[in-house]
Amino acid sequence: MRICFFCNLIEFKPKGNVLQFFIMLRALDRKLEQLNSRERKRYAFDCVLPFSFRNGTGGFHFSHVRFHQSDDPTQTILSLDRKNKYDFIFVRGRNDAHKLLQHKESLSQKLLYLATQYNLQDPYIMGRTDYLFRNSRMVFFQTEPNAERYRRYQLNKGSYSEQELTRKIQVLPQFVEPSRHPLKMRREDKPLHLIMAGVIRPRYGLAVAAKAIQLIRKHSPKARLRVLYPSIVGTYRKRAQQLLRMPGVSDHGQKSMWETKEMIVDSGIGLALLYDRTSDQNPSHSYLSRILEYMALGVPVLTTRTVGNLALLGEDYPLFVEYAFDIQEKYMRLCDPQYYEEMSQYVKERGKRFLAEHAVEPLWDALHREYRLGTKK
């Protein structure tokens, strides 16, 4: 099986889309490592990137994936395909997949498209999404709710049978990379802190979190809101910087994936708010990578009730919040060690499937199932 992977990343940065892509590749690399040398020869995995990736960057070491830097990724993929005759070409991103097919439409027989988002209210976006769906072997969505929503959309259009949609629509969630070393557990005698990790956007509720820590500190004066982020959305920068300077808020800036894991465990309570005011509610159908990280580490997460979070945590999850005083109330409950342990075990059990070693299995199976179908044609 020969696969070329492409993601239009400008640089390596410890943020969601970058980490998702590299964690997936690393998980596939580990799958190849588990094979004996004879079996491994049946596979060839290449990856084209706009920047030069140095093996080991960010803690990502590869033994069986070959990286190619290119200023013109589309032409490089076409050239590599002529040379290697790939079985699949995996592309993350709507515009890049579309551009590839515009250069060579016959690649639709090989295209695996990772759809990161779509908007049912936008005719242009849906036109491109539907074109890619028609002209690909499989389309991967990052969450069950988004995959199901698109499946219903196609069923209503009547262009595909349920059987065909079941084969062609797959779910490829973000993976959580396992820790390299056992993490030092938080001592019970230490105060619980809130931690927010990830890109800062207006919809992620930093103002609500900052207000919540003021309320919490009236009863627990040593508690902090720790904020880790690779970037701040430009239009929100001034307001975000004001909030990051508020009493009780600790601005930690950008941390590596490994440092972030350590700080999450040391803090004790994950915070992941989402106030989605988009017309299509696409963010609400997503899984925030920070929530998956908290869950996999067994750190209780306070989060808003969205379609995606209901799929992750269950209808009856007791730590859904909306307002600052909700966060304060849940924080006080989690100060009970027995309750904290119950919630820790609950999220850890539900987060297990996103650990890379488990999450890669459905992808591995889907690739081989589709590969076998191709060899029969």
Model regions and ranges:
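Conserved donor-binding/catalytic core segment of Leloir-type glycosyltransferases
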Residues: 3-7, 140, 180, 184-204, ...
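Nucleotide-sugar-dependent
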Residues: 14-15, 204, 258-263, 270-293, ...
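A charged, aromatic-enriched C-terminal amphipathic alpha-helix characteristic of glycosyltransferases
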Residues: 16-19, 67, 179, 326, ...
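Glycosyltransferase donor-sugar binding loop
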Residues: 49-51, 224-238
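Short His-centered aromatic/hydrophobic patch
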Residues: 91-96, 115
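A short, active-site helix/loop in glycosyltransferases that binds the activated sugar's phosphate group
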Residues: 123, 134-167, 176-178, 311, ...
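Nucleotide-activated donor-binding/catalytic signature segment of Leloir-type glycosyltransferases, i.e.
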Residues: 229, 237-269
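Conserved acidic donor-binding segment of nucleotide-sugar-dependent glycosyltransferases
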Residues: 288, 315-325, 332-338
